[in-house]
């Protein structure tokens, strides 16, 4: 398992889906299930953060006088 902070949104979503699948089978031991749940919660939080950052970037797109995108304005913290 890789460090969650280094994962792209798509990588984190794939891992989260796989984690949920493992939990849904019910075949993991209790300890493994707890570890999977904890990692899944961290993956979910990472995905939410990446989505929020993307939303902020989209909101910062600047428009020219004709209404066409003319560039971007960096969002704070990015």
Swiss-Prot record:
Q: Which GO cellular component does the record give, naming just one?
A: exodeoxyribonuclease VII complex
Q: Which UniProt keywords apply?
A: Cytoplasm, Exonuclease, Hydrolase, Nuclease
What reaction(s) does this enzyme catalyze? Exonucleolytic cleavage in either 5'- to 3'- or 3'- to 5'-direction to yield nucleoside 5'-phosphates
The Gene Ontology biological process terms listed for this entry are:
DNA catabolic process
Picking any one GO molecular function of the record gives: exodeoxyribonuclease VII activity
Q: Which InterPro entries does the entry mention?
A: Exonuc_VII_S, Exonuc_VII_ssu_sf
Localization annotation: Cytoplasm
Instruction: Summarize subunit and interaction data from the UniProt record for this chain.
Output: Heterooligomer composed of large and small subunits.
Per its record, how is this protein called by name?
Exodeoxyribonuclease 7 small subunit
Task: Look up and give the organism this protein is from.
Answer: Paracoccus zeaxanthinifaciens
Which gene is transcribed and translated to give this protein? xseB
């Amino acid at each position: 398992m890789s460090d969650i902070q280094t994962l792209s949104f798509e990588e984190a979503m794939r891992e989260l889906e796989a984690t949920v699948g493992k939990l849904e089978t019910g075949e993991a031991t209790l300890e493994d299930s707890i570890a999977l749940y904890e990692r899944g919660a961290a993956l979910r939080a990472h995905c939410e953060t990446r989505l929020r950052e993307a939303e902020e970037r989209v909101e910062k797109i600047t428009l020219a006088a004709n209404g066409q995108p003319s560039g971007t304005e960096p969002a704070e913290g990015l």
